Amino acid sequence: MAARPLITVHSDKGAASESNVTLPAVFRAPIRPDIVNFVHFELKKNGRQPYAVSQKAGHQTSAESWGTGRAVARIPRVRGGGTHRSGQGAFGNMCRGRRMFAPTKTWRRWHRRVNTTQRRHALVSAIAATGIPAVVMSKGHCIEQIPEVPLVVSDSVESIKKTKEAVVVLRRLKAWPDVEKVKNSRRFRAGKGKLRNRRAIQRRGPLIIYGTDNGISRAFRNIPGITLVNVNRLNLLSMAPGGHVGRFCIWTESAFKQLDNIYGTWKRPSAEKSHYNLPMPKMTNTDLSRLLKSDEIQNALREPKKDKARRLQKKNPLKNYRVMMRLNPFAGAQKAAAKAVEQRRLKEKQAKLDQKRGIATPVEGAGKGRPRKTTAKPTKAKAGKK
């Protein structure tokens, strides 16, 4: 929210004058984009024009079903002959030249009623957002050279009657780049709106809010992107177009001074809106980093645990050799001994097989000469009974 107590009034020459105005309380109101978006979405429906298709559309033909037994669908079919149209399906929404499903009616619920207090809260939030430069720049407005936000000009601007004088004022206030942005953004609309007298679209420019119309509306109305509105006729559709807060606003001094009287303050209610009190923010200070680092909160918090034991992954020593060696260093010797026993057993088994088959078995430690040949002893046949 805007927190400056005084706002400088700039003259129509673009220079800062010696007079200051107090920042109205409405600029310190809480910003609720959710309320603004909902209210804008509902109010935008009130400008729709009812439309409907003709009640006779799709039924201006003579058609009757052929019934069953003809191996064709039971959809009504056009009578007659001698043309391609005869025998074709009609009336159903699945047919060519048919009526639509659920034809639109003019007695649809076009308009929406929004609670009065909800509309006022949305407008107050939109006004408060116009006083924050970061929000205005995020909306796409070119305000890098603007002397101050919110921008307040003297009441002499309300008496301007020529457009060329209005252009000079905008150039002196460094607001002309935002108008140039609007001029460069003009382009053809996507879709069928081009065929319905809505060919071009463009961005939104500054919103000029005045107190008394002494010619200001005729001077500024032909500048691209400029919107003019009386301070007593502020509405959400012009203050937050598209339901997005943060439009660049130029206030006249008389209009800026009337805001406290129109929307009230936290000490007194509004003088022009019956039973309306300015919404109170939930937090007087929205700087969370400053709040969390304050002494009051830091003293109530415990110190962070720096020696916190981290959970390690527990591995199965029966499957992981390194973990087993760390738990039982003798496991390596046991494994080597078991491996040696297994190798000796395999050698003895192979030697027995070689001896039975009459194969020379190489002797360990012998040279590279011929291997020693072992012959099996002949076995004596036992004398059997005849």
Swiss-Prot record:
PANTHER family: 60S RIBOSOMAL PROTEIN L4. It comes from the Eukaryota. Residues 341-386 are annotated as: Disordered. The keyword Ribonucleoprotein applies. Residues 369-386 have a biased composition (Basic residues). GO terms for biological process: translation. It comes from Urechis caupo. PROSITE patterns: RIBOSOMAL_L1E (PS00939). Keywords: Ribonucleoprotein, Ribosomal protein. GO terms for cellular component: ribonucleoprotein complex; ribosome. It holds the Pfam family Ribosomal_L4. This is Large ribosomal subunit protein uL4. The keyword Manganese does not apply. Residues 341-357 have a biased composition (Basic and acidic residues). Belongs to the universal ribosomal protein uL4 family. GO terms for molecular function: structural constituent of ribosome.
